[in-house]
Amino acid sequence: MKLTQANYYSKEANSLYFSVSQFKDFMKCPAMAYAKLSGEYEEEYGRALLLGSYVDEMLTGTRKSQMKFLEENHSDLFKKNGEPYADVGQAIDTIERVRKQPLMMKYLSGKHQVIMTGEIEGVPFKIKMDSYKEGEYIADLKYLRDTRSPNLFQNVVDYWKYTWQGAVYREIVRQNTGETLPFYLVIATKEKPVHLAVVEINDFNLNEALDTVKKNIRRCQAIKEGKIEPERCEEHDCSYCAETVILKEPIDSDLLGMSTAQIKAMKGDI
């Protein structure tokens, strides 16, 4: 299957290829990831994703993809009188801030929405890069709530697994071109005032992240193919597990609100 802008996110493409997002899903909750692929579960995406997609399109999309996005999402972005909703207005201001930053625009000046495919441990992967400059860099645009991590023991790059994204993108580009390129994040926040940053993920972290992908991707593929039963994560922030849970017995009050990892640690399973 030849991937294009039109079919990149199609059910067939998602069935044939892993993406970084799909890998993250299987690592977080295999049952949720499997249900999404089979069509049994459709994740609800709020305005955060819509706004992120809007900023991404306006800064790295093609003219054709921008017009398509605006047409499909016009009523969610703009009021009946044509004025943008408040959060969209803030996103527009952020886009202008980014365009006035030479360093940010340097890393957003490559070829946009470049698709490549490859394999990791024999498993097909697909990537679509926000900004790719042959022989120089790979860059991805992020529109974040802020640059602080929800986890005190991880920085925001590690928390959101951007290292996995950088590692996979760099490896697939290497397979296609023979070049190992640096990976950058071009970051703008939703804060007032907006915080801006250009971040390079270092080689050590990218290599470590690629090792993580290599160690886990075959199991993820086996789950995807139905060869291994997909486990439920039962984490509090997993909408799929919350919506499909069947209670079997009371739990101890000390366990209420704890993460699965915390409960396993208490039981000595970790």
How should each PLM-predicted stretch be described?
Residues M1-K128, C233, D237, K248-T260:
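Metal-dependent nuclease catalytic cores that hydrolyze phosphodiester bonds in DNA/RNA
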Residues Y45, V168-I270:
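Metal-dependent nuclease catalytic regions and adjoining charged, substrate-binding loops involved
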Residues Y107-D211:
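Mg2+/Mn2+-dependent nuclease catalytic core
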